[in-house]
Amino acid sequence: MVSFTVQDRKLSEIEQKEIDDRVILWAKNKNFIFMMSSLHQIIWSNSSWEIVHHFNLVNNDNEIGLAKRKALLALHPDKQHGASAEQKYLATRLFSVIKQEWDIYIRKKEV
């Protein structure tokens, strides 16, 4: 008999869409700094992510870069050992969005 754990379960298209919608709503109209300072609002409670306060990021490129690196480490798809299917999918989506928004943030700073 084969037994499956919660981590082995695949998400349905409906479950994926619900997570996608949450990520879109969370990211909507936010710049990169606001995304980093609000990541705790969407990430699961027992993740390795530590809250980053907005006032620590404003005009502080070192803190912004550090927050980005910590977020990508916490969300990296290969680092989701023991996470549920929902957490893995959410991590993958957030990882992608944060990478995209970081690229936009860097391009705007270069102008």
Regions found by a protein language model. Give the residues of each.
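Eukaryotic long, low-complexity intrinsically disordered regulatory regions enriched in serine/proline
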Residues: M1-K10
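N-terminal J-domain/J-like co-chaperone modules of DnaJ/Hsp40 proteins
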Residues: R9-V111
